[in-house]
Amino acid sequence: MAETIRPISKIELRFKLADIKKPSSQIIVYCNSGDSKRFDLIGATERIDNKSEPFFNTTINIDYYFESVQKLYLLAINHNLKTLDFTKIDQLDVVGEFTPTIGDLISRDGKRLIGDIKDKDKITGKIEITAEEIYETGHNIILQLKGTKLDKKDLFSSDPYFKIYKSSPSGNSIVFESSVIKNNINPIFDPIVIRLQELNGGCMFRELTFEFWDHNDIVDDELIGSFRTNTDEILSGIIKEFPIINQKLKSKKSNYEHSGIINFIDSRILYKPTIQDFINGNGNGNGNGDGNCLIDLMVAIDCTESNGDQKLETSLHYNVKPHQNQYIRSLLALESQLLNNFGVKLEKRVEVFGFGAVINKHPNHNFRFHYIIDDRPNTLKAGISGVIELYDKAIPKIQFTSPTKISSIIEDATRYSLQDFHSTQLKYSILLILIDSDITDYESTVDEIVEASKAPLSIIFIGVGEYSFQNIPQLDGEKNGNIRLIGRFDRKQIRDNVHFISFKEFSINQIDFQNEILRKLPNQLTEFMEFKNYLPNGLSYTQTEIKKIK
């Protein structure tokens, strides 16, 4: 067996463009390794409008393999759409491209590289890339700041906010910007939670700069002052007060003392729990009780006519032994991953939805499989074996139709995921959607996914058959450049809760297919729990004594 090559660290990339003529700029990052000719989408910056020299706050993290040649394909694009599929480069409005290697980047002084971006050999602007090697800690840090007697930059008061910068060989990099507090020279800012590696790259003694500004609606914001410190100094609590210094005022006034005082009224390291911490708690759980996080599963099966006549061997639903179709293989792969990777045995009956069938002489896009065989839900077997038994009984009786709609099933799944969910008994649900073509209710589906992002639910699409999917991949944050979906009334997806997998891409290697199915689940579950401020066994951060790490 070949040895798995592990990254030695992560590289954090920051970007700046110059001399750009297009109104809306964004950078998409692709990467390959070694002799691979395929560039994989890594991520994207935010979009910045109406700036010829945009500096992007969004950082892109890439695993760094010392022994491999890792080529970057950086694409500067212009767009003003809500969503784009960044995997389809030919559909993007390209400003220019740049193709360095990570090795070339980190070998430069200050790990800073400036180059020309080109479109069809024509220079269309410049790009500046700054790299930093960071070390993952698995922790977050919570900070809350209180200001006292800040300078009055307006007639009677100030509208203060602050920025945090971390030092680097190429200069300071911004890591956080707070919201503005109106008309208050004694502000108490909201608590902030930052990943420790983003704040200091894993170094507790790295210099941090806190800048305080007065916001103005018409003229430029005005600097109140700043101070420097490091994470260790903040957490130790030795320094109780940090004077804000405005160097310009200090040089002009002989009696100048400071422009205000800052206190850290809260500063703690928050251990970031893993999915295993939630499922197993203190090690005595099985993912199905004991006060730990329950894992619940729902399955939705495509019953549209594009599957083909289920009695024929050419049908995607043909499932006569020894033949095992892609629907069944996907179900078994999911069961295997839940048990082997997370120790979860599904001991409850799994709800099975169908969509795209004729029910009572009408197309139905949200029905329950047990109704097809006139069976009571409580008589069915638990787990995936129950799903397969129900599938084998129901599929021969179903009349397939069209179109393909799944939004109402996601709506129901969201509602089910919230049932019996509370802080003393956590539960997280998975909706597995097995589908053979793109959806026709895309906008409604986006709306429901946006709502589902606030619920304890992950949505996994597995595309079966030979269809080349177009719109479903755009629902997956990894495939659209980590752009959050936007639904009705400009409601925004708060986290990436969707994963799309095409079965045919893994038809040769079933092990890779199994590993891919639940690859995103750990981050999706822990991100939701972090959003809700829950710790394993239902404790919240405010209820838990967390030791400071020095």
Swiss-Prot record:
One cellular component (GO) term of this entry: nucleus
Keyword Mitochondrion listed: no
UniProt KW Repeat keyword: yes
Pfam families with a match to the protein in the record: C2, Copine
One example GO MF annotation: calcium-dependent phospholipid binding
Family: Belongs to the copine family.
InterPro entries, alphabetized: C2_dom, C2_domain_sf, C2B_Copine, Copine, Copine_C, VWF_A, vWFA_dom_sf
Name of the protein described by the UniProt record: Copine-F
Domain VWFA residues, every copy: 296-521
GO biological process: cellular response to calcium ion
Domain C2: 1-115, 123-246
Keywords of the record: Repeat
Species in which this protein is naturally found: Dictyostelium discoideum
